């Protein structure tokens, strides 16, 4: 047939129209050159891609340098963010923490540009707002920035210094917006362990400090404040039963929650104190847990690691809430461990102070004993100023009504007659309860031991009922005369009638075996109240708690004084309103008796205040 070379061929420049297989290599090269021209990394010599430079405004791309932009694209701040030109898409920066429209101005410059500023967990993202819409300005990492508010300026601005040719001023529209920006910037930079501004004080060595000591939050460097309380707790988001190990940090205006990760602390959330309140009264309350409640959150149960942490948290929360005027948690009376001035209502014959003495004047707070309040528990630690010790050397001194109580039995008595409402006072130092000293009372001690025992504070609790030994030598008949019998009893005057507390009368029986009985001289006779109608067999037991230094009573003491009630009682005048009785000097049966003037015996028994 012939050779193909003999067939006439079209010109070489026209062969492309007859080609069935286009060149793949040529297409790849043409596409690469076109994309490079669009993104500005390679400019053609003919410059026909100037119209395609609109792709420079796509956010998240790698913006070329200003040497590839001879034309003015209305981006005056484009050249200052070279440090922020990372190949990092915006979607990989995390969630937006805070954003708003601000104005940017370099220091010592008058050019101001509107800009949208977005704060990510570790970056600041700038977008310019112009005629073309939002355009990418730059991306600055927080690790290379320093934030500091401007002082003495009328503008609501803060200053950013870092990888910039000059400090950059960010102008906010209001003071509230400035506070929000400073708050979020300070918090994010604190979470990264950074120093916030040039004027911030040095942190110093943190080698032996817990990691949360670096956590700070503030509304500026001038008002910077640190964490008040921090501890490891377990958090339970009700109604879920799962508990998480967290680090709870209390700041002056918020509660921050962190988790301890291998790479450091991870921020979990923050609760403003103005939006939450602490609940200590829950049905399933543990001994060291409390609830955090709020209208916009699920109830959170906080379980402290120890009771000491629990008490410290409650104390710090009450202190911060009281200062800020927020919702106060319940007072210390709702939980043990914290003490506060309290008001107690007691019933019984008297109230005991912390040193074992009773007070009729009730000028200091007195805590009722377990017998006075059978349904309540007795506090383990109490403390308040002890009443002064009465002078025992002056026989004419008016008694202050303070006496030392001996162990008394727990038999029923008319305690419902007196109801006291004692107003509390500040508790300076708690006085620990010591029941071991109750057994150290020496009933047959001399005056030296008596004076020494007055200085030793004893427990306000009653000890076990005192049972006198059968071999006791001291009998009620050993006392010759009622005056010496009264001197053996450490009594106190009747309560001030102007006081709101009703009086409680106690019978003092008189034995018929004592001859020549005389009443105590002076105002004693004018301070005797009317006798009770019937004899109470508990009167002798009640005297055992009021004896200061007399010997132990025999077991048949009630039988000795029973005949005293057989006589017809005599009517005695009531006590005057403002006259205080003066008692004779207390004496012990084991010591010489002082001579007392004799007076005619008074028929019947006397009613004596104890």
From Swiss-Prot:
Low complexity composition-biased segments: 504-526
Location of the protein in the cell: Cell membrane; Mitochondrion membrane; Mitochondrion
A GO biological-process term: positive regulation of apoptotic process
PH domain location: 96-192, 227-324
An example Gene Ontology molecular-function term: phosphatidylinositol phosphate binding
Disruption phenotype: Male knockout mice (KO) gradually become fat after 20 weeks of age compared to the wild-type (WT) mice. At 36 weeks, weight differences in whole body, epididymal fat pad, and liver between the KO and WT mice is significant. KO mice exhibit a hyperphagia phenotype with the plasma concentration of leptin higher in the KO mice than in the WT mice.
Highest taxon of source: Eukaryota
Record PTM: Phosphorylation is essential for its mitochondrial localization and regulates its interaction with C1QBP.
Region spans: Interaction with C1QBP: 61-100
Tissues where the protein occurs: Testis and adipose tissue (at protein level). Ubiquitous.
N-myristoyl glycine lipid attachment residues: 2
Membrane topology note: Lipid-anchor
One Gene Ontology CC term in the entry: plasma membrane
Renumbered residue ranges of the record's region Disordered: 1-30, 327-357, 371-431, 443-473, 493-610
Keyword Iron-sulfur among record annotations: no
Keywords: Cell membrane, Lipoprotein, Membrane, Mitochondrion, Myristate, Phosphoprotein
Listed InterPro entries: PH-like_dom_sf, PH_domain, PLEKHN1
Residues found modified as Phosphotyrosine: 307, 462
Biased composition (Polar residues): 371-380, 391-402
Its biological purpose: Controls the stability of the leptin mRNA harboring an AU-rich element (ARE) in its 3' UTR, in cooperation with the RNA stabilizer ELAVL1. Decreases the stability of the leptin mRNA by antagonizing the function of ELAVL1 by inducing its atypical recruitment from the nucleus to the cytosol. Binds to cardiolipin (CL), phosphatidic acid (PA), phosphatidylinositol 4-phosphate (PtdIns(4)P) and phosphatidylserine (PS).
Quaternary context: Found in a complex with cytochrome c mRNA and various ribosomal proteins. Interacts with C1QBP, ELAVL1 and BID.
Domain notes: Both PH domains are essential for its mitochondrial localization.
Protein name, UniProt field: Probable pleckstrin homology domain-containing family N member 1
Organism field: Mus musculus
Gene: Plekhn1
């Amino acid at each position: 047939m012939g050779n193909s070379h003999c067939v006439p061929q079209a010109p070489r420049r026209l062969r492309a129209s007859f080609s069935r297989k286009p060149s793949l290599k040529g297409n790849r090269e043409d596409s690469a050159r076109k994309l490079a021209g669009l993104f500005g990394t390679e400019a053609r010599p003919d410059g026909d891609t100037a119209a395609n430079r609109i792709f420079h405004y796509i956010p998240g791309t790698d913006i070329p340098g200003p040497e590839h932009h001879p034309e003015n694209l209305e981006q005056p701040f484009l050249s200052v963010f070279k440090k922020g030109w990372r190949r990092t898409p915006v979607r990989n920066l995390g969630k937006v923490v805070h954003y708003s429209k601000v104005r940017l101005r370099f220091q010592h410059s008058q050019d101001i540009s509107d800009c949208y500023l977005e704060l990510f967990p570790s970056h600041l993202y700038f977008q310019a707002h112009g005629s073309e819409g939002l355009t990418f300005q730059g991306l600055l990492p927080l690790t290379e920035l320093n934030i500091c508010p401007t002082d003495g300026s009328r503008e609501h601005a803060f200053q950013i210094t870092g990888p910039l040719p000059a400090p950059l001023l960010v102008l906010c529209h209001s003071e509230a917006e400035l506070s929000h920006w400073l708050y979020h910037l300070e918090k994010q930079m604190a979470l990264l362990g950074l120093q916030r501004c040039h004027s911030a004080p040095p942190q110093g060595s943190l080698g032996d400090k817990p990691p949360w000591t670096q956590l700070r939050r503030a509304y500026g460097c001038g008002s910077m404040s640190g964490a008040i309380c921090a501890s490891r707790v377990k958090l339970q988001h009700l109604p879920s039963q799962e508990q998480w190990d967290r680090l709870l940090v209390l700041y002056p205006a918020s509660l921050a929650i962190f988790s301890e990760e291998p790479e450091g602390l991870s921020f979990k959330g923050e609760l403003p104190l103005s939006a939450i309140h602490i609940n200590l009264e829950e049905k399933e309350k543990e001994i060291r847990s409390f609830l955090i409640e709020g209208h916009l959150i699920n109830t959170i149960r906080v379980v402290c690691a120890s009771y000491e942490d629990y008490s410290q948290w409650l104390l710090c929360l009450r202190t911060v809430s009281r200062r800020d005027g927020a919702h106060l948690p319940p007072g210390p009376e709702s939980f043990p461990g914290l003490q506060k001035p309290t008001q107690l209502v007691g019933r019984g014959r008297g109230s005991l102070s912390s040193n074992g003495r009773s007070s009729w004047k009730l000028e200091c707070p007195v805590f009722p004993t377990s017998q006075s309040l059978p349904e309540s528990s007795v506090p383990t630690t109490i403390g308040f100023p002890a009443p002064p010790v009465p002078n025992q050397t002056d026989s004419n001194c008016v008694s202050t009504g303070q006496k030392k109580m001996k162990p008394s039995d727990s038999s029923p008595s008319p305690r419902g007659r007196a109801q006291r409402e004692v107003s509390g006072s500040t508790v300076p130092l708690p006085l620990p309860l010591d029941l071991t000293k109750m057994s150290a009372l020496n009933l047959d001690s001399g005056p030296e031991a008596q004076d020494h025992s007055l200085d030793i504070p004893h427990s306000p609790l009653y000890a076990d009922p005192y049972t006198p030994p059968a071999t006791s030598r001291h009998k009620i008949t050993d006392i010759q005369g009622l005056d010496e019998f009264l001197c053996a009893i450490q009594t106190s005057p009747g309560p001030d009638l102007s006081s709101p507390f009703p009086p409680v009368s106690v019978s003092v029986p008189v034995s018929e075996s004592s001859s020549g009985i005389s009443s105590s001289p002076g105002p004693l006779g004018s301070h005797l109240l009317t006798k009770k109608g019937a004899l109470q067999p508990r009167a002798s037991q009640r005297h055992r708690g009021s004896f200061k230094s007399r010997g132990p009573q025999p077991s048949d003491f009630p039988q000795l004084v029973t005949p005293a009630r057989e006589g017809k009682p005599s009517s005695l005048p009531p006590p005057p309103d403002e006259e205080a009785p003066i008692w004779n000097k207390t004496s012990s049966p084991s010591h010489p008796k002082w001579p007392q003037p004799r007076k005619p015996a008074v028929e019947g028994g006397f009613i004596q205040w104890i």
